[in-house]
């Protein structure tokens, strides 16, 4: 049995599709990964976003990231299936090295989520200082 590695697959699905079609495309991508021997560890659906440039004359895409473990030969089989899926505007599969995982941990440690209690408290303290003047 081959050694498995951690990968991340980022997909951009046609944002002009109905929600049901997008859900079906996401399900198809996950099904392909598991059928080819991968094991999905997490799925992050970012949602509809404007693309940086038109892709096949489309400017809105539905973005999603899927983390999974698989053996190296499985990646080619997954890409072969995704390549011919018409609802996918783009896809990219990368190997998550230890350096990338360490960088991700540092970013998460020092990032502040907008709308978090810390942001709200900081904004309220700034507003109260302005009213006193």
UniProtKB/Swiss-Prot annotation:
Q: Which Pfam families match?
A: Ribosomal_S6
Q: What biological-process GO terms show up in the record?
A: translation
- Cross-referenced CDD domains, in alphabetical order? bS6
Per the record's keyword annotation, is Ribosomal protein included, yes or no? Answer: yes
Q: Which InterPro entries match?
A: Ribosomal_bS6, Ribosomal_bS6_sf, Ribosomal_S6_plastid/chlpt, Transl_elong_EF1B/ribsomal_bS6
Keywords attached to this entry: Ribonucleoprotein, Ribosomal protein, RNA-binding, rRNA-binding
Can you supply one Gene Ontology CC term for this chain's record?
A: cytoplasm
At the top level of its lineage, which domain of life is listed? Bacteria
What Gene Ontology terms describe what this protein does at the molecular function level?
small ribosomal subunit rRNA binding; structural constituent of ribosome
**Its family?**
Belongs to the bacterial ribosomal protein bS6 family.
Purpose: Binds together with bS18 to 16S ribosomal RNA.
The name of this protein is Small ribosomal subunit protein bS6
Source species, please? Chlorobium limicola (strain DSM 245 / NBRC 103803 / 6330)
Tell me the gene name.
Answer: rpsF
């Amino acid at each position: 049995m081959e050694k498995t590695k951690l990968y991340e697959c980022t997909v951009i699905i046609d944002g002009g599709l109905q929600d049901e079609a997008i859900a079906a495309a996401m399900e198809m991508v996950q099904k392909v990964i598991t059928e080819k021997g991968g094991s999905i560890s997490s799925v992050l659906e970012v949602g509809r976003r404007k693309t940086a440039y038109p892709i096949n004359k489309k400017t809105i895409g539905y973005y999603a990231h899927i983390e999974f473990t698989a053996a190296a030969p499985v990646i080619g089989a997954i890409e072969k299936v995704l390549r011919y899926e018409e609802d996918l505007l783009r896809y990219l599969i990368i190997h998550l090295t230890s350096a990338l995982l360490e960088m991700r941990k540092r970013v998460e440690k020092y990032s502040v989520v907008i709308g978090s209690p810390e942001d709200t408290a900081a904004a309220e303290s700034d507003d109260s200082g302005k009213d006193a003047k």
